[in-house]
Amino acid sequence: HPFNAVYSVGDQVKVEWKGSWWDAIIIESNGENHLIHYSGFESSWDEWVTAERIQKPN
């Protein structure tokens, strides 16, 4: 997918983790990196990811 995709706080996205794509929401962003929360998981799983690991859901 294009690396110039723009993601915003509150966006519902898919995030790649160990070869699988998981539902997540962006809860913070600093431009290059995004803090995501995996839907249905505790906040201890929240992590900063680069745009390469994010895609918009179909």
Description of each model-found segment:
Residues 1-58:
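Eukaryotic chromatin- and chromosome-associated nuclear factors
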